[in-house]
């Protein structure tokens, strides 16, 4: 039996690949209209619909999804399974050969691989719960799983009316219901084909165990999906859960356990209808929200507490909203407890089916599974409590231990009380569960450690004297009310106290059991489980605190708005501002300035008239008459300037300097200058100064000049009569007269 479990672990690694492929399978629900046509198979037949064309592109686990989508059409199922093309280099697991047996394999009885296929796709449905809403790929896979799970177990589906009753109240949208009906019709067509094969499977315990796993995996999807997307719970989960209501203890869909009381068909509809109305009444919403926050406490089963709030809301609504249904729920639970006592030893694997045989990484899947396990545990503990604890045994079978003496968290908390309607004081709840798990030693040791560790922790919370709550409920309530106690108290005692007492059922009836009383009681003043009245008082006090405290926090009185009418601004300029909130009337008065009476400061602009309204601008230009203006310079007096561009007449007169000007130098007297460029006439006169000149000083020298012939060409003779000063004594030398004449003549020739 260990081999199929190990194969589940290996196959779950492939289930992770489905998450990667969901984005690529967006058109799966629409028949893959955009995908290329399917190439014909070897025998020449072409697959109708070519639904696996996307899967052919890659040899990854996407090939596994190809047969899954094809099974959605019953008439195309045989051809789709027989003619699926497998790329080269693809393993059997990837191609889906080992996971999806065709009709021949099913007829031959190859059943060992079928549970693997169911678990894989139940996981693939739950891998990404956040993507449930409105996505075609998930709905397609969910339809396939909807076909496979009930048909493999060989159980006929409930009638269509019952399925609709279970589908509709859970908030299913109309399109989801329409999508689920074709799948349900396909199930009715497939179930006869596989009925003989399903009956063969009932022979072995291993197959029963695998059916348990399938049923719980199908049951786990509604809480996990409803908690994240309440409107899109898969039709598979709903139909299976509806059919497996009576057979909840054995977890075999369609085969109710012996002695179990089947619930009416409209039970889930009433429960779901009350679920939507009742959770806001009590503190159920608080634990449900904080249940997710408290999840990290359990490193092994993180999802245990995450899924519990959904069941809390579902069953809590049953007790608070409808007392009549509470009686119904308690009645079947008593039957389940008695039935479970008989089935507990024969089927050792049965409680283990609720255990996480698969990797803990599948978070949403374990949510509902552990929630389902909590139901089994409550039934088991009820039976055990009846045998061990006298207080439970005394209570009537119809209302086992929910007498007013044990309201505990349930009395004040509508979520916790209904979660286990048949729960006794349950000191032995978790040990009972662990003991039922221990026979399944075939599973790896790590799984058993996980069971003891995680279930010890959760069970520690369940098995408190107030243990009327499922592990998720207890965990959430502990997390909300005494967050400090949740981690330290349950972890240490369960490890020490519970495992040795797992086999001893009577040991937990003792009031002084170390594991349960001190560590699990919320108030330290209640050490022993038998003392239920004090616990009742303490529990009644404590639970309302968190809702009241949260309400006091949430419902703080709003601060009144300050009166801004009496506030005056510190800036004086804003006092005259009036603001009308409704949008006041803004009047902008445009007054035109009359500038007709304004006189400009500049006198020259007096005649400029400006009309503000854009009138005609008249600029009067008066030309300046310069005819009367006389220039300061007399020579410009005859210049006439006309401002309009008149004629400029410049008269130039020649000046005669001879008449007015006398030259200081006598030689220039006869020079006449004509302004226009006249003739220059230079007259040279002989100088006769020698004749009149006398030397001022007589130096006694004689200048002898003898010139028998007076000629201008002769060289100057020796001047004997010239004094040292240069003056010539004309008296002493009679010859100077002639000398002077010669010098003057020579100078005249030279142009002097």
From Swiss-Prot:
The modification N6-methyllysine is found at residue 570. Residues 50-60, 142-151, 233-252, 387-400, 432-446 have a biased composition (Polar residues). GO terms for molecular function: apolipoprotein binding; DNA binding; enzyme binding; heat shock protein binding; Hsp90 protein binding; identical protein binding; lipoprotein particle binding; microtubule binding. It is a peripheral membrane protein. Its main location: cytoplasm. The modification Phosphothreonine is found at residues 58, 60, 100, 464, 480, 486-487, 492, 516, 523, 528, 542, 714, 738. Polyubiquitinated. Requires functional TRAF6 and may provoke SQSTM1-dependent degradation by the proteasome. Residues 205-218 have a biased composition (Acidic residues). Residues 173-182, 192-204, 289-313, 374-385 have a biased composition (Basic and acidic residues). The modification N6-acetyllysine is found at residues 474, 536, 570, 592, 601, 609, 622, 628, 632, 642, 654, 658, 680, 696. There is a cross-link at residues 33, 565, 570, 578, 592, 609, 622, 628, 632, 642, 654, 658, 664, 680, 686, 696 (Glycyl lysine isopeptide (Lys-Gly) (interchain with G-Cter in ubiquitin)). The modification Phosphoserine is found at residues 35, 50, 191, 204, 489, 496, 502, 506, 509-510, 513, 525, 546, 548, 573, 596, 600, 604, 616, 635, 663, 667, 707, 711, 715, 720, 727, 733. The modification N-acetylalanine is found at residue 2. Coiled coil: none annotated. The modification N6,N6-dimethyllysine is found at residues 474, 622. GO terms for biological process: adult walking behavior; amyloid fibril formation; axo-dendritic transport; axon extension; axonogenesis; DNA damage response; female pregnancy; intracellular distribution of mitochondria. Disulfide bonds join 602-633. Residues 1-567 are annotated as: Disordered. GO terms for cellular component: axolemma; axon; axonal growth cone; axoneme; cell body; cytoplasm; cytoplasmic ribonucleoprotein granule; cytoplasmic side of plasma membrane. It comes from the Eukaryota. Keywords: Acetylation, Cell membrane, Cell projection, Cytoplasm, Cytoskeleton, Disulfide bond, Isopeptide bond, Membrane, Methylation, Microtubule, Phosphoprotein, Repeat, Secreted, Ubl conjugation. It is found in: Cytoplasm, Cytosol; Cell membrane; Cytoplasm, Cytoskeleton; Cell projection, Axon. The keyword Cytoplasm applies. Promotes microtubule assembly and stability, and might be involved in the establishment and maintenance of neuronal polarity. The C-terminus binds axonal microtubules while the N-terminus binds neural plasma membrane components, suggesting that tau functions as a linker protein between both. Axonal polarity is predetermined by tau localization (in the neuronal cell) in the domain of the cell body defined by the centrosome. The short isoforms allow plasticity of the cytoskeleton whereas the longer isoforms may preferentially play a role in its stabilization. This is Microtubule-associated protein tau.
């Amino acid at each position: 039996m260990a081999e199929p479990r190990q194969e589940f672990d290996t196959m779950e690694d492939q289930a992770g690949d489905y998450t990667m492929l969901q984005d690529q399978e967006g058109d799966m629900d629409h028949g893959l209209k955009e995908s290329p046509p399917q190439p014909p198979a070897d025998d020449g037949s072409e697959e109708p619909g070519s639904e696996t064309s996307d899967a052919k592109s890659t040899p990854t686990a996407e090939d596994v999804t190809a047969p899954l989508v094809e099974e959605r059409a019953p008439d195309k199922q045989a051809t789709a399974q027989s003619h699926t093309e497998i790329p080269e280099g693809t393993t059997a697991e990837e191609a889906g050969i080992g996971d999806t047996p065709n009709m021949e394999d099913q007829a031959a009885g190859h059943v060992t691989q079928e549970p693997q296929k169911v678990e894989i796709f139940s996981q693939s449905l739950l891998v990404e719960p956040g993507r449930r809403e409105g996505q075609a790929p998930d709905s397609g896979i969910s339809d396939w799983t909807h076909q496979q799970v009930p048909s493999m177990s060989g159980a006929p589906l409930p009638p269509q009316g019952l399925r609709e009753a279970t589908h509709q109240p859970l908030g299913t949208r109309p399109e989801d219901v329409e999508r689920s009906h074709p799948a349900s019709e396909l199930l009715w067509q497939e179930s006869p084909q596989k009925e003989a094969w399903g009956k063969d499977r009932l022979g072995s315990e291993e197959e029963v165990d695998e059916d348990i796993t399938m049923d719980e995996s199908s049951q786990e999807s509604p809480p996990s999906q409803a908690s994240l997307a309440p409107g899109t719970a898969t039709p598979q989960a709903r139909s299976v859960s509806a059919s497996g209501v009576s057979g909840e203890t054995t977890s075999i869909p369609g085969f109710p356990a012996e002695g179990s009381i089947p619930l009416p068909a409209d039970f889930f509809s009433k429960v779901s209808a009350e679920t939507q109305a009742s959770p806001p009444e009590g503190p159920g919403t608080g634990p449900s929200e904080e249940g997710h926050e408290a999840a990290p406490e359990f490193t092994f089963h993180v999802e245990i507490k995450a899924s519990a709030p959904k069941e809390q809301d579902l069953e809590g609504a049953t007790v608070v909203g409808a007392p009549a249904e509470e009686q119904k729920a308690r009645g079947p639970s008593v039957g389940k407890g008695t039935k479970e006592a008989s089935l507990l030893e024969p089927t050792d694997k049965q409680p283990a089916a609720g255990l996480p045989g698969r990797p803990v990484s599948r978070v949403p899947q374990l949510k509902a599974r552990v929630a389902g396990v909590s139901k089994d545990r409550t039934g088991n503990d009820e039976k055990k409590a009846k045998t061990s604890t006298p207080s439970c045994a005394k209570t009537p079978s119809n209302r086992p231990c929910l007498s007013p003496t044990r309201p505990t968290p349930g009395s004040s908390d509508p979520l916790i009380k209904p979660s286990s309607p048949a729960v006794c004081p349950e000191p032995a709840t978790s040990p009972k569960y662990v003991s039922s798990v221990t026979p399944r030693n075939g599973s790896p040791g790590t799984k058993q450690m996980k069971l003891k560790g995680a279930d010890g922790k959760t069970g520690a919370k369940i098995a408190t004297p107030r243990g009327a709550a499922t592990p998720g409920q207890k965990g959430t309530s502990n997390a909300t009310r005494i967050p400090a106690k949740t981690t330290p108290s349950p972890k240490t005692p369960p490890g020490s106290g519970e495992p040795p007492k797992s086999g001893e059922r009577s040991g937990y009836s003792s009031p002084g059991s170390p594991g349960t009383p001190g560590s699990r009681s919320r108030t330290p003043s209640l050490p022993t489980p038998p003392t239920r009245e004090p616990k009742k008082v303490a529990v009644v006090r404590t639970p309302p605190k968190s809702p009241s405290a949260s309400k006091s926090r949430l419902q703080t009185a709003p601060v009144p708005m300050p009166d801004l009418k009496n506030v005056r601004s510190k800036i004086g300029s804003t006092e005259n501002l009036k603001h009308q909130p409704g949008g006041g009337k803004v009047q902008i008065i445009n007054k035109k300035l009359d500038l007709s009476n304004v006189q400009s400061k500049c006198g020259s602009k007096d005649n400029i008239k400006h009309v503000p309204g854009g009138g005609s601008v008249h600029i009067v230009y008066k030309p300046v008459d310069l005819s009367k203006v006389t220039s300061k310079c007399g020579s410009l007096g005859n210049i006439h300037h006309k401002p309009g561009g008149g004629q400029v007449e410049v008269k130039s007169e020649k000046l005669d300097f001879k008449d007015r000007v006398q030259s200081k130098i006598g030689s220039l007297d006869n020079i006449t200058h004509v302004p226009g460029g006249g003739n220059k006439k230079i007259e040279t006169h002989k100088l006769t100064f020698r004749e009149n000149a006398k030397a001022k000083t007589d130096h006694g020298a004689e200048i002898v000049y003898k010139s028998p012939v007076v000629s201008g060409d002769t060289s100057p003779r020796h001047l004997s009569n010239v004094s040292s000063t240069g003056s010539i004594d004309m008296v002493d030398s009679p010859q100077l007269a002639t000398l002077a004449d010669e010098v003057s003549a020579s100078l005249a020739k030279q142009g002097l």
